[in-house]
Amino acid sequence: MPDNHLYIIPFFSFFLSIIIILLGKKFFKNRALISKGIPIVGGLSIGLPCFLAGVLVLYFSGCLAKELTGILTSSLLMFIFGVIDDRYELSVKAKIATQAAAICLLILQGVQTRIVYIGDIPNIVITFIWIIGITNAFNHLDIMDGLAGLVAFVANLAFFITGYVNGNMLVIVLTLALGGALISFLVFNFPPAKIYMGNSGSHFLGFVLASMALVNSYAPLERPLALLTPLFILGLPILDTCFLIIIRIRQKRSPFKKSDDHLAIRFLKSGYSKKKILLIMFLITAVFSLLGLVLSRVLNPSALLLVLIIIFIGVSIIRKTNSVGNCG
């Protein structure tokens, strides 16, 4: 596909997503895939347009075939497992097993971390931990209307910028496809939500964004700090999940069970409206993403001090909301 035709991708993804949502709202009414009377069609409206947009790119251009095929097929598998989970509520072990299967398929097609300082086996292990962590982080983040989709959109935009700056056509294609679908989804998912994302959507989002981070270009040898770029772009879901796990372990509860320990829920308990919480989460994600983009370009290792300061601020905010939530 010629570069000057890339603008077609987000429009294709957007309008196909709109069609799927409108048809899905009608089709899933009074059927199994509903929650509180609201259809769980968000995953389909994000996953299918992204997949078909990728297939179109493969049809018109063979230069991205290997890695794009790997991400498309493995993310489709993750989406299918998510639909099954939405319908039958898989056990934790079954979820981890299905996610591992999708990750294996991805790695077998050549998509993994390629950190030059370590060998192949450590890179594969890091890939597993990274993708399974981000996939479940977005699943945990899907606790409020518009939240997971909004955070994903900001992170996707940041990945688009890194891909554009580095001339990474694969990342550009993926972010354009995902961005178009996310815009249409958010129109129907902002509070009060008319559709839900479901596990199929949150797992797909986390998986694609995590995979996108792997195929992006960050760190030539002269810019080692750029390795932190994807960690910052996805900083909010990572931090939220890490603190969630720490809190639950301290309270001797399973990290995998649903609870109200999330940062967004604590803001809600403190009296913030849902729209104000979304604004706060948007700003946090935007700041983290901006820092990630800055780190991808700096040469001076002293910039690590900036990283530590931001981490300290983020930790302080979460601890403060944690104490406020406990008092409420």
Map each language-model feature to its residues.
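Small-residue-rich transmembrane alpha-helices that serve as helix-helix interface/gating elements
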Residues: 300-316
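Cytosolic, membrane-interface loops and tails of multi-pass inner-membrane proteins
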Residues: 22-39, 243-275
